[in-house]
Regions:
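Conserved AdoMet/S-adenosylmethionine-binding subsite of the radical SAM
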Residues: 1-128
Length: 128
C-alpha cells in the first residue's frame, strides 16, 4: 500500500503529473486491508472493485483472491470505505454466460449494495 500511496502522491503533485485525485481511478481485486487503509487516507479518487460475483462459491472459482478475502468481507470493507470517505465505489462485473449472469445473482448484488451509493459496470464477455 505504501507504494500505491507514494505513486498517487507523485501523479497528483504539481511538480509531478498534476492529475487531480477526482480524475484517478484505483482498481482492486478486493484486498480488504488495502481498502481499509485507503479509506483512512480520505482521498477523492474513485475506487474500482473487481467484483464479478456476489456469492462466495462463484467468486472463488472466478477470482482466487476470494479465498483470502471472502466476498462478504469485501462488501463489509466497501461499506466501511463509503462511510469513511463518502465516495461512491465503482464495481466491475464481467458477465460470464451461465456462470455469474443469473437473476438471483443480480438480486443479491442489489441486496448487498443497498444503502451504499455506487456504480455497477456490467461488462459482457464475448465468445472468442
Amino acid at each position: 500500500m505504501a507504494n500505491v500511496l507514494r505513486f498517487l502522491e507523485l501523479v497528483n503533485h504539481p511538480d509531478g503529473m498534476n492529475i487531480g485525485m477526482r480524475h484517478i481511478s484505483l482498481s482492486t481485486c478486493g484486498v480488504v486491508p488495502g481498502i481499509d487503509a485507503l479509506a483512512e487516507q480520505q482521498l477523492q479518487l474513485t475506487l474500482s472493485v473487481s467484483l464479478h460475483a456476489p456469492d462466495s462459491e462463484t467468486r472463488s472459482r472466478i477470482m482466487p483472491v476470494n479465498r483470502a478475502y471472502d466476498v462478504e468481507l469485501l462488501f463489509d470493507a466497501c461499506h466501511r470505505y463509503f462511510e469513511k470517505t463518502g465516495r461512491r465505489i465503482s464495481f466491475e462485473y464481467a458477465m460470464i454466460d451461465g456462470v455469474n449472469d443469473n437473476d438471483w445473482q443480480a438480486d443479491l448484488i442489489a441486496k448487498k449494495l443497498r444503502g451504499m451509493p455506487g456504480h455497477v459496470n456490467l461488462i459482457p464477455l464475448n465468445d472468442v
